[in-house]
Swiss-Prot record:
Family: Belongs to the poxviridae protein P4a family.
Cysteine pairs bridged by disulfides in the record: none
Name the UniProt record assigns to this protein: Major core protein 4a precursor
Organism: Fowlpox virus (strain NVSL)
Subunit structure: Interacts with P39/A4.
Localisation per UniProt entry: Virion
Length: 891
């Protein structure tokens, strides 16, 4: 069994630092087809956070959120008593605002294993909950977190803080709803307003309580709650002086008297009778009688089950009107327990209401055990695969429940293990980022990398306009005219350029000159600048590509050009004729943002990739983007590598520091703009990380990091070829000229071989997608339509795919063989040597070729392993009966 104490976690990192480390270090260790546990798609947040941050709602399942809110409402009401207040450090204000009163008070139960993590990446109430959980006892955290017990949940050892009551209710909704009628200094009742009109249920309650009040209090009551207005709005006739029975023995229900003592005791009751006799009694004694009679069953249930500790009195005392003698009725005579309502009347009534509803409503039961609260057994955790254990440790906070001195506590798993305590349960808390759990984000990233994007396989738009209708000579003449244009008013510049173009076009002959990608950028900049457009340039690096963005404003449109011509004294008809005469040029101008060639120019709508955030005025601009791969020397940390003199120094060097630094900044930008999702992150991941992920996914060994050192260090980074080249150069700083040339030849050949391999991989993946689609059609035909396709068809397809791969490999070897000859002459020319003066011997050429051969062989071996995995995947999809009829050739 592995050493559990060595499990990898990223607990101390947060925000972009955490995300960067996760993607750059952990993601490459996962296979592309790594299956993430569906249970991790949802996580945990305190339900109060979802009230103010709706994007967090998706973290919880619908049932889990509603049940948690139900329990939180109950626990909040029960905690308004002093001895429970410290266990629910939240206060809901009159306007529905929820504020924290957390002051690190754990009620005397201090966790013996302290936690050093700040949890600043968590929403506010979730952060408080985690602090309570890691600083106090588990029961405290469950009370504040709205824990709902599952029938199979393991028991915990801790002081009993609450009776674990949970049923469907709207307490939190009512307490936090901001649109209410009334004033808190007169009543705690919160009648809800919908579109400014009081709900009928609340209005009915108010009218029944109003009938119990004496006239002067009734008038104040009407003014505070706007009774007349809401009665009219609800089509209810208001009785100004209601006549009701207020005899405690004969009145229809005590409900509204109970409600009076719960919310409206600041108003004055009308005369109260008992057996036809008007009585004089103070409010606390009357409340004791009314509440005890109304909740007699609930009081007995509380006593029988020892749910709460209530205070009682032995008798009910009142005085008949016009009498000096008190009459006493004992609890024994009434056959009930009489509550002492001298203090805390609203709280006691709320408590009894909760117990009453719990007896008649269905108890909340979660569908499954909670990973956050109940977790998994320690043995189950220890028996997990290492990759699953590492994934949990880096994408989730891992807590451990443990018992100490008869109390159950919860601390970080690593802290518990270091303290040499034995965990009883491992609780999993998926980390959250911008409304998603990190496991969900990783799944999206893997899916987007699996789904081949335009970045990996360029799609050329056949509708792009790459010419302006002029021949080579005509284009150069027009280009020179643009260079000579001085700064002029936009309307004048537009007219002069269109007229000049039309004049050149009349005498121009020959086929159109197609603008090369190298000239395109310069031409559109000069064209729009000369026409008076404002061209703003932004440059940034995304993934391993350089993005140059041109914002041309105002937006290029035919309407704008027409307006400029009319402003330059052209009539509507003249403007249309001039635009028609310059049709090819105008079409080119209108199509500049339609290109989609990855290595040339294309339009991306996301403002992030322009290097800045668009303002409202820039929405009316035309965006053109030029995208090109970053040179390999600009991607690597040349200074760091060259300054390393030992193996350990090279291993500690961040080889791809420049593009990793750009990646980290791009992550910060995504977080700042709230555009975090799998697609956006997959787009900005640098190629050195993508290379490692793809290689790992195929299970391929990519050779050694340092080929010519005695200690051979394996690495999974295909892009790390460049490290080997630079390290070889470091071995001997006084190389002979011939060795220097040979090393440079190797550099050139390796880069060329990688470039050619990229082209072959793209061709292969395009072909593989067609074969895979064909295999999927066969799969669905057999699976869903129950039609049997013979093995001959399946084997024929596999043989064709194998032949396709062999043809691609043969083409690659031919390309490298020819490029090798070119590279030799190119390197000699760049070093300033003359072949006649410094002849290169056959021995030098042979040495360069021998060094290059294993590099090329390594790439072909990697390609073979990759295509073999594709071949096996297609075979598995089609599932021929004779699986050995055709096999993949590893040679």
């Amino acid at each position: 069994m592995m050493l559990i104490k060595n499990i990898v976690t990223l607990d101390q990192l947060e925000s972009s630092d955490y995300l960067y480390k996760l993607i750059s270090s952990v993601l490459p260790s996962l296979c592309l087809d790594y299956k993430i546990d569906p249970k991790l798609a949802n996580g945990y947040v305190h339900a109060l956070d979802t009230i103010y941050s709706p994007e967090l709602i998706s973290i919880l399942t619908d049932g889990e959120r509603s049940q948690q809110l139900d329990t939180l409402g109950i626990n909040y009401i029960l905690s308004r008593k002093n001895d429970l207040g410290i266990y629910f450090p939240i206060n809901i204000r009159e306007n529905g605002e929820i504020v924290s009163t957390w002051n690190k008070n754990t009620g005397g139960y201090t966790n013996p294993i302290p936690c050093t993590i700040s949890f600043n990446d968590l929403p506010p109430f979730t952060k408080i909950l985690i602090q309570i959980r890691t600083m106090g006892c588990e029961a405290h955290a469950r009370y504040f977190g709205g824990y709902v017990e599952h029938p199979s949940s393991p028991n915990i050892l801790s002081p009993k803080i609450n009776p674990n009551i949970s049923f469907a209710n709207s307490y939190i909704h009512s307490l936090t709803y901001p649109y209410i009628e009334g004033r808190a200094d007169y009543s705690t009742y919160r009648p809800l307003l919908i579109n400014g009109i009081m709900e009928k249920k609340d209005l009915a309650n108010l009218l029944n309580v109003r009938a119990l009040l004496e006239p002067m209090s009734r008038a104040i009551f009407d003014a505070i709650f706007k009774i007349q207005f809401h009665c009219n709005a609800n089509n209810i006739v208001l009785v100004q002086n209601p006549n009701i029975d207020t005899d405690l023995i004969t009145m229809q229900t005590l409900k509204y008297l109970v409600m009076y003592f719960q919310h409206f005791s600041g108003f004055t009751l009308r005369d109260i009778y008992l057996g036809g006799v008007r009585i004089r009694v103070d409010n606390s004694m009357l409340a004791s009688y009314v509440v005890s009679i109304y909740f007699s069953k609930e009081i007995k249930y509380i006593e029988d089950n020892k749910l709460f500790s209530l205070d009682y009195i032995d008798q009910f005392v009142f005085r008949p009107d016009n009498s000096n003698l008190n009459i006493t009725v004992t609890a024994q005579q009434l056959g009930i327990r009489i509550l002492n309502m001298t203090s805390n009347r609203p709280y006691i009534i709320n408590l009894l209401n909760i117990v009453s509803k719990s007896l008649v409503r269905h108890r909340n039961v979660p569908k499954e055990i909670s990973l956050f609260w109940d977790g998994m057994s320690y043995d189950e955790y220890k028996n997990m695969k290492f990759i699953d254990m590492m994934f949990l440790g880096t994408t989730c906070y891992l807590f451990a429940l443990y018992n100490k001195n008869g109390i159950t506590y919860c601390s970080m798993l690593n802290d518990v293990l270091r303290a040499e305590e034995t965990p009883i349960r491992i609780c999993v808390f998926p980390r959250i980022l911008k409304g998603k759990t990190i496991p969900t984000l990783i799944r999206e990233i893997l899916e987007n990398i699996n789904n081949i994007s335009v970045r990996d396989f360029p799609k050329y738009d056949t509708h792009d306009v790459k010419h302006i209708g002029l021949s080579d000579a005509g284009f150069m003449l027009f280009f020179q005219f643009l260079r000579l244009m001085e700064n002029k008013e936009p309307h004048i510049a537009v007219k002069e350029i269109l007229m000049a173009y039309t004049g050149i076009k009349i005498d121009d002959k020959g086929s159109p000159y197609y603008i090369t990608p190298e000239s395109y950028r310069t031409f559109i900049f000069m064209l729009f600048k000369a026409m008076g457009f404002n061209v703003r340039v932004n440059r940034t690096t995304i993934s391993s590509h350089s993005y140059t963005s041109y914002y041309v404003s105002p937006r290029v449109s035919k309407r704008y050009l027409t307006n400029m011509l009319q402003k330059a004294s052209c009539s509507q008809s003249e403007a249309e004729k001039l635009l028609s005469s310059a049709h090819d040029l105008v079409s080119f101008m209108l199509s500049v943002n339609n290109s989609s060639n990855r290595d040339s120019y294309r339009r991306i709508n996301r403002s992030f990739f322009g290097g800045f955030k668009e303002s409202a005025s820039e929405e009316d601009a035309t965006l053109v983007q030029f995208i090109s791969p970053v040179n390999i020397l600009d991607r690597i940390n040349v200074k760091g590598i060259l300054s390393a003199n030992a193996l350990n120094e090279i291993m500690d060097t961040d080889v791809f520091l420049p593009e990793n630094a750009n990646f980290k900044e791009n992550l910060k930008q995504l977080l700042k703009e709230d555009t975090i999702d799998g697609k956006s992150i997959a787009h900005i991941i640098p190629l050195n990380t993508i290379d490692r992920l793809i290689v790992s996914a195929g299970g391929v060994s990519v050779g050694e990091l340092l080929e010519n050192l005695d200690e051979r260090v394996p690495d999974e980074n295909a892009t790390n070829e460049v490290i080997e080249l630079i390290t070889n150069a470091l071995k001997d700083r006084n190389m002979k000229d011939s060795n220097f040339i040979a090393t440079n030849i190797l550099n050139s050949i390796t880069q060329i071989s990688e470039k050619q391999m990229d082209g072959i991989k793209k061709i292969t993946c395009h072909g593989t997608m067609m074969f895979k689609e064909l295999a999927m059609h066969i799969y669905f035909t057999e699976r869903y339509f129950k039609a049997k396709i013979s093995d001959d068809v399946k084997i024929s397809i596999l043989e064709k795919y194998r032949d396709f791969i062999e043809l691609s490999k043969s083409l690659y070897k031919d390309l490298i063989g020819i490029d090798q000859i070119k590279s030799v002459l190119s390197i000699v020319h760049r070093t300033g040597r003359n072949i006649d003066d410094n002849p290169i011997t056959q021995e030098d050429i042979q040495k360069a070729y021998n060094i290059a051969r294993p590099k090329i062989l390594k790439l072909t071996n990697y390609y073979t392993e990759m295509t073999k995995s594709y071949f096996e995947n297609i075979k598995r999809i089609m599932n021929p009966e004779d699986a050995n009829a055709v096999v993949f050739d590893n040679e």
